[in-house]
Amino acid sequence: MAGLGFDETELRLGLPGAGELAARSSGKRGFAETIDLKLKLQPAAPAAVSGEEGAQEDKEDADAAAAAADEKMSMKRSASQSSVVTAEPDPDKPRAPKAQVVGWPPVRSFRKNVLAEKCKAAALVKVSMDGAPYLRKIDVAMYKSYPELSMAFQNMFTSFTIGKCGSHQQLKESNKLRDDLEYVPTYEDKDGDWMLVGDVPWEMFVESCKRLRIMKGSEAIGLAPRAVEKCKS
């Protein structure tokens, strides 16, 4: 017992020989262990290489997708251009006649000219009446006789009492106006003279009438003798 040391006779909890393993493990790392550790860490390098290869493959896939998208866009553009070319009208085929447009937006100049020609063809005459705050326009050529024109005056100015236009023969037989007439239709001829409506034949009246005025009977009394004298001459 005297030859045994304190460490050998010390009682400890643990497996037999655990103390020696602890002593060995507490020492410095040996050369062999260091080499083994380096060899175990070397396989990490190929992993990095494989990551670079994956990135390269992803880039190639992205480039291929972009090229496919560009090809689709070029195909769409070519299809749209071909449709525009096919939509062009045939120069040999005659165009359809354009319909006349009335209202807004304003019509074009050539259509205005057509409307102006139609207005010139019609014998439009202004019609005014003493005491009426408005004017009218009528086409004298639309009517066939003086009685029709008289009815048109009655419809234009319904609130006034207008004398009926007699025939040319009736006016020649009477040299004065009736006193009971409130308004009498008169007209201005090409010479600028004011005369009673009905003092000349209807065809001559249509050609010479420039303006119509329905004046009061008291103001038109002096026109009857002059109209009759002009008819006689």
UniProtKB/Swiss-Prot annotation:
SUPFAM superfamilies: CAD & PB1 domains. Induction: Not induced by auxin. It is found in: Nucleus. One of its GO terms (biological process) is auxin-activated signaling pathway. Residues 122-217 form the PB1 domain. Highly expressed in etiolated shoots. Expressed in roots. Residues 1-27, 46-100 are annotated as: Disordered. The keyword RNA-binding does not apply. GO terms for cellular component: nucleus. It comes from the Eukaryota. The keyword DNA-binding does not apply. A motif (EAR-like (transcriptional repression)) lies at residues 11-15. This is Auxin-responsive protein IAA11. It comes from Oryza sativa subsp. japonica (Rice).
